[in-house]
Design a protein with these regions (language model features):
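Short, Lys/Arg-rich flexible segments
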Residues: 1-158
């Protein structure tokens, strides 16, 4: 997948990738867990990043809810159901382009558990040719609305 600019359009969709939608709707949050389960059953990710992405996205959403912050995020991890030409905005995981409260959540997680969140281990990355600080779970923000049909196809395993 290659983007022309920081805010660009998907030129080519890669195979065997998963779209995870994060929204304020609880149904969408349940869909994230289900999509991770389906993909892990298929064995598409032997190293577990996909499961970590879902688990920690959910924990991050809970962290935001406790602070009264909105949870209308869209997380894109390895998606084959994106359409060419879809406009996206990408950011690094955790530290700079996503949000400061994600960074605080990772600090809290590390303090409480004694370990770094698996999806953000320092030895991960770089990914998709981004700079060396882009590690772990890659977060994309999709500006176009993702249709219900795409979510349904993913949930049905198509």
């Amino acid at each position: 997948m290659r983007l022309n600019t920081l805010i660009g359009r998907v030129e080519r969709v890669q195979r065997d990738m998963l779209l995870i939608v994060r929204g304020a709707c609880e149904r969408e949050e349940r869909a994230i867990v289900e999509l991770n389960r389906l993909q892990l059953q298929r064995g598409l990710n032997a190293e577990g990043e996909l499961m970590n992405g879902g688990e920690y996205s959910d924990k991050y959403a809970a962290f935001r809810r406790r602070k009264g912050l909105p949870t209308d995020h869209v997380y894109l991890l390895l998606s084959g159901d994106l359409q060419d030409g879809m406009r996206v905005e990408f950011g690094e995981t955790g530290f700079s382009l996503v949000s400061s409260d994600w960074k605080q959540w990772m600090v809290d997680y590390t303090r409480e558990t004694g370990s770094w969140p698996p999806g953000n281990k320092p030895h991960y990355g770089p990914v998709f040719g981004l700079d060396e600080t882009s590690r772990g779970m890659l977060v994309w923000r999709i500006r176009e609305r993702v249709s219900e049909g795409i979510r349904n196809r993913l949930l049905q395993g198509r």
